[in-house]
């Protein structure tokens, strides 16, 4: 599939991806499958039985999720397609996307943490200052920090055209955030 549909051998002709041909893609996908089968998939059923909760102001993930995410990050899976200069492995996004697909198939609820963190990294790479990139991306790639999704507001649901929350830059370079969110995915 990586050869025929993804054209991985053509991707390997792009500068900086020369070592990311079919053999590399196959090896990475095989290791990803082992990780997901051995670590992530077993948490699917147990996560449904002992789901996450909000207890006295503290978010508690399903048993095993924290340890599994630490293993995911330590194994380099969070940084697979992220730039080398921020601690990533610099592999083509197509290889990273295939690995994310395996994680999603193994346990969709667990995979959201990695997916949302990847989305936050992508937002920083696209629109963040060099200072923000240097501060946040290495911590997200390493698994020390994660990303969330904060869209839903009481008056808007998830209709982004109707959200009212604002981030106003302050003189000291920080942002003052005002508004109300009613759901924070992986918060």
What is each of the regions a protein language model found here?
Residues 7-8, 105, 122-130, 142, ...:
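Short, well-ordered loop/turn and helix-capping segments at boundaries between secondary-structure elements
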Residues 112-130, 157:
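N-terminal glycine-rich flavin-associated loop
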Residues 1-112, 131, 135:
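Amphipathic, small/basic residue-rich leader segments at the start of a protein or domain
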Residues 81-85, 112-116, 150-151, 181:
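Glycine-rich, histidine-containing beta strand-loop boundary motifs that form or position
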Residues 89, 131-187:
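Glycine-rich, Trp-frequent "lid" loop and neighboring beta-strands that shape
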Residues 53, 117-121, 142, 153-155:
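A glycine-rich phosphate-binding loop feature that marks nucleotide/adenosyl-phosphate handling sites
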């Amino acid at each position: 599939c990586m050869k025929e549909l993804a054209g991985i051998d053509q991707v390997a002709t792009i500068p900086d991806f020369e070592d990311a041909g079919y053999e590399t893609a196959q090896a990475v996908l095989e290791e990803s499958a082992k990780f997901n089968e051995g670590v992530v998939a077993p948490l699917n059923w147990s996560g449904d039985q002992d789901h996450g909760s909000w207890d006295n102001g503290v978010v508690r993930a399903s048993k095993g999720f924290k340890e599994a995410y630490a293993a995911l990050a330590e194994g380099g899976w969070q940084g697979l397609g992220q730039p080398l200069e921020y601690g990533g492995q610099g592999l083509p996004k197509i290889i990273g996307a295939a690995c994310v697909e395996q994680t999603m198939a193994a346990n969709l609820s667990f995979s959201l943490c990695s997916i949302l963190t990847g989305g936050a990294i992508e937002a920083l790479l696209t629109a963040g200052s060099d200072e923000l990139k240097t501060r946040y991306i290495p911590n997200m790639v390493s698994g020390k920090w994660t990303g969330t999704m904060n869209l839903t507001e009481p008056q808007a649901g998830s209709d982004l055209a109707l959200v009212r929350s604002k981030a106003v830059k302050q003189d000291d370079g920080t942002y003052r955030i005002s508004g109300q969110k009613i759901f924070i995915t992986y918060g």
